Every structure is written in C-alpha cells, then in structure tokens.
Amino acid sequence: MTEETISQAVPPVRDWPAVDLPGSDFDPVLTELMREGPVTRISLPNGEGWAWLVTRHDDVRLVTNDPRFGREAVMDRQVTRLAPHFIPARGAVGFLDPPDHTRLRRSVAAAFTARGVERVRERSRGMLDELVDAMLRAGPPADLTEAVLSPFPIAVICELMGVPATDRHSMHTWTQLILSSSHGAEVSERAKNEMNAYFSDLIGLRSDSAGEDVTSLLGAAVGRDEITLSEAVGLAVLLQIGGEAVTNNSGQMFHLLLSRPELAERLRSEPEIRPRAIDELLRWIPHRNAVGLSRIALEDVEIKGVRIRAGDAVYVSYLAANRDPEVFPDPDRIDFERSPNPHVSFGFGPHYCPGGMLARLESELLVDAVLDRVPGLKLAVAPEDVPFKKGALIRGPEALPVTW
C-alpha cells in the first residue's frame, strides 16, 4: 500500500503501541480512533505498513460478512499486527474463505449446536462443583483464577474435544505459550507444533469413531475424505485454544463484579436476570488488546465514503462495535436491563466463534456456582492491586485474590 493508491482525503496513519492496560480499562487509543471517524488507519508494533480500521457496529458486521473481504490472502502478507510473531498454519480455518471454510466448519458443527453443548452441561456442572468444593475445603484466602476460573474452562473444552483428563495440563501449557507474546516466536511455534502433533495422533486414532466429541467428529470426517488430516488438526488447535478464552473473560467478569459489589448483589438477589446480565458483561468487557486477525479487500469497496482499494488490509474492532452509541445507548454504562443487546463479542459472519454458545453456558454456570455457593465472596486486595496479564494478546487477571 502506498499513499498514491488512495485519495487525498484519507485519515493519517495512527501508531497503536502495545501497552498493558490496567484492569478492564478501555483502550484510550481505540477511544480516540473511534472519535476520529468510522474508518481510520493504523500501524501496529509488528508486521509492515498500515491497515484500515473499521469501528462502527454496522460497518464491522458488513466487513465480517462480506465476501469482498477475505482471510486467505493474509497468509502471504506481513500485515501490520500486534503479535510479534505470525505462525498460522496454511489451510487453518481462521485463514480460509468459503467454500473451504464452510466445509471445514461443517465437520464439527454438531458439537457446538444447542444439543451438542447441552451434552456437556451436567458433566460441566459436576466438574465445577468439585472445584468449588475444593476451594471451600481449603478455606480463605484463595486465588479464584487458580482454584476455579482456570481449571474449569480447560476441563470443559477438553471434555467437548475428547481430550483425556490426563492431558489437560499439557493442553493448558501449550495454549499459554501460543497466546503469550512475551516468550518469543520460537517458543510459541514449538508449543503449536507440539499441540499439532498431539491432535494429529488423537484424530488419526478416531477415523472410524461414532463419538460426539470434536476429535471423534474430525476423525470421522477425515475417514470419509471430507477434510484432510491437516485441516482437522488446524481446526482442533483453534478450538482448543479458543476454549480457554473463558478463563480470561470470566476473570474480568468476576473482577468487575467484586470491584462493584452492588452488581454482584443484584445477581444474587435476582437470579432470573443472570443470562441477560452475562450478555451485557460480555458486551462491556474489553477481552483483548488492540485487534485480532485482519482481512484483505479482494476488490475496491467504499465504506462511509472512504474508498478501500483491492489488496488493502482491513481490521475490524469488535470492542469498538460493542461501544457504538448508535446501537448501545450510554455504551460505557453496564446496564443489566439492556435489550436488545446485539453485541459482537463472539464475532460475526462466517468466522463467528463456534464456541459462543459453550462460552455462555460456562459463564452462566460459573456465576451460579460462585455467587450462590460463596455468598460472602469479596476481593482480598484492592481492585487496582489485582495483577493483570502482561505481554498477552488476550486480557485477563493473572490471579484473582479473594476471601469470604
């Protein structure tokens, strides 16, 4: 991209540095970009050049659902990005466009339907009760992240994936190394290769499986020649890693509820509003730093009067879309009565997060178990003293010290 490829009226390129924001603070750079206009230009700490940034709710939905913007073309580019290393596997579902993307997602769709998610509800509730039991037996103080918020999502996603309980620790370790930007490219790539090898073996053993877990569904699809083993492994890795996002989201959720006890007390006294309240918290929580994966414009497209040329890189900000005042009145306020609430915390369009329904289930189970079974729960330190992750792409508390 060069200045000559675009018109004179384009916004200036804004540097967006990598910073570790305190708590659940909204990124001030993103706030400024939202004020500058619906379509701006950014340069992130890594990669090359600049990219467009789209922040309004309707435009974010347009870009993510429009075949004129593709992911596959990103593979051969060093698009400006937050992550210091870029190690996607060619053919991975996150970098495929329809129809290949649709074919691959179809292979595991059954596991993420309402029926598929309900299949693990009671087992998930049982595993969560065991974790809360253990925390209560040990007595206060406790680290809610270590005791509950970290092991629970790992157990649930491993259950859904068909990963044996004995391998959960390895999965968690690999995921943390892949998601962190502080260990360097070699460490992240080695962790990803080890997870790839693990799923290659596991899926390969299940080519004749009739099981309902994800690796069985993938193994059966490979056995029917609907997808390749490489495609199956790439999808399994993405789903496994994504499953742990609940740890960070729920960590921010409980940090917020315990920092503002009136919110937690309302959820205790009005349990019927919990599903709606969780949706509002999912909208409000800034779950990541900066932006995620880019897209490439496959032809010239005009958005809000700005011409995006074929070949230009484009990012959307789901965080910004969730604070669009045209869609969410008083967007910075947490409003448990907000309805409708068309947030895009799980994305939109063909790349919508397949685990969105599972994440909602886990969040509801966590709120029920923690608030109902530990009524005196409170932070053991001041809210501003809760340590948050540093050098990470996904935001969340490193630990959540609590007492009761």
UniProtKB/Swiss-Prot annotation:
Q: Which InterPro entries match?
A: Cyt_P450, Cyt_P450_B, Cyt_P450_CS, Cyt_P450_sf
According to UniProt, the reaction catalysed is: 2 flaviolin + 2 reduced [2Fe-2S]-[ferredoxin] + O2 + H(+) = 3,3'-biflaviolin + 2 oxidized [2Fe-2S]-[ferredoxin] + 2 H2O; 2 flaviolin + 2 reduced [2Fe-2S]-[ferredoxin] + O2 + H(+) = 3,8'-biflaviolin + 2 oxidized [2Fe-2S]-[ferredoxin] + 2 H2O
What superkingdom heads the lineage? Bacteria
Q: List the residue(s) that the UniProt entry marks as the site Involved in determining product regiospecificity.
A: I87
GO BP field: pigment metabolic process
Stored Gene3D superfamilies: Cytochrome P450
Which protein family is it in? Belongs to the cytochrome P450 family.
Q: What is this protein called?
A: Biflaviolin synthase CYP158A2
Instruction: Give the gene that encodes this protein.
Output: cyp158a2
